[in-house]
Amino acid sequence: MDMKVVPWRLKEDFLYLMSCFYNEGQEGIPDLAALFRGVEIIQAWSTRGRIPHSVESTSQLVSSLISNDRSQKLALAVSISRFVSGLLDPIQQSQYAIPMAVLAKSIDLPTYFVELRHAITHEELPSLPVLRQAAQRALSWLYDHYWNPAATAESEDTYDYTETNELHKFEIKRKVKDLLKQWRSWRKVNVSANMFLPVEEHDYIQQFEALVQELVTTANLRLPYIPASFVDDEKDLDFAIETTNLDIVVSCFLEKRVLIPSRTMPISFFPKLKNVWLPLLQSIASKHSFFLPALFTTLWSEILEISQTVDSLVFLDLKEKEELTDKESAGCYLAKWYAYLMREAYTGQPWTSTLSVTQTDLASVLEICLQRSDPFTKIIIDELSILDKELENKFSPLFQYRSDMFDSRILDEQEFEDITLEQMKTELNKFSVRLNNIEAQADSSTMEFQGHVWYKPSVEPSPIGQIIES
């Protein structure tokens, strides 16, 4: 059996590339971003070795079709000519030259392409509409005679690259856990030691720097197998997470005995936990530009996932609850770490320079938290609502309402029976007064136009041309 070396490692890579150029069943045209992505992947693969002619031709034809510059006509002519020559020249093996039309019939290539190639080479270039139509017909021919047969052929590749990655991740995770265990054991004994002194002053500083460098180096190492969908995005966070050990290192930090206590602990223990791990986080963040953004993003995903497991109809005040479950305790500490990192980044602390948090980001987080009723997002609101005065004023009625809901309790049937009609009226009057206050405040500071509420700025009248100090 003939074996050929190809630039993709797995059939899934080939299928992903095919999906960039062709929709399933060739129905419609893929979006422009997918076409560009396919061209980029082939360009990256070309650095690995020879690209099959049909794959390279597809890339050239697509590039010519999506080009908008003045040279599109010439680009289409060249790509069509190469498409025909690349198919027919390799089978021209006779001692005497065989007409191209005959060779074309042997591979079921319409003679239309041969005639068009002859016109491009020896006559005046055909018009742009003719070339565009020819390029599209060439792509259809390539789908029928190369891409679809290759995609549906039985794969003889028995090597499981996914399993290789999983074994690699297991080994890396064990290594990272050992390094974090070393740090935890030493830091608990030397909890007050300054870890940012010059390296030459203390031996423990040298050991600390060596441990940090080992973690950073490990995080930067590539996975054994990188999917085709992650080619040529070197400066992208998603690329770093999907193709290196960064995701493994970050996940190790979010386990028990690291950023989460080994057993259920009250939230008041957080300052002590922070004192243990903050120097290590700060040092890694200064040496790995993606570490802090990856940790921040993963924390948020974990918090949202845990919050979905809490019954939205039950409001828990964790400060008064006698015993927390493991999941509740973990969720609280993840929320505390997330709020701490966001506060540090929002206030511009130097060690968080790789993590950008704008007012829009802060507002988005607060809005999402306000839509949830779990105790973890309440922690985030309590920590972050005071960071920005403008946002605090904007959301204050919602903050107050949510706080009141958390202070309330779900009553059983017996407790409902004990409530008198007068008590219910008093409670209703209280809410009415609050609603009137909110409406009065809205009337004085907002106006409605075409269904939208606009906040009116409080600006004193002044003569035209006079500078108003804000």
Swiss-Prot record:
- Tell me, what is an example of a GO biological process annotation in this record? rRNA processing
> What subcellular locations does the record give?
Nucleus; Chromosome; Cytoplasm, Cytoskeleton, Spindle pole
Q: What is its main location?
A: nucleus
Signal peptide boundaries? none
Pfam families linked: Las1
Which GO molecular function entries does the Swiss-Prot or TrEMBL record give? endonuclease activity
**UniProt keyword list:** Chromosome, Cytoplasm, Cytoskeleton, Nucleus, rRNA processing, Transcription, Transcription regulation
Entry GO CC: heterochromatin; Las1 complex; nuclear envelope; nucleus; rixosome complex; spindle pole
Function comment = Required for both pre-rRNA processing and heterochromatic gene silencing.
Family affiliation: Belongs to the LAS1 family.
Q: How does it assemble?
A: Interacts with crb3, gcr3 and eix1.
Please give the name of this protein: Pre-rRNA-processing protein las1
Organism equals: Schizosaccharomyces pombe (strain 972 / ATCC 24843)
Gene (name only): las1
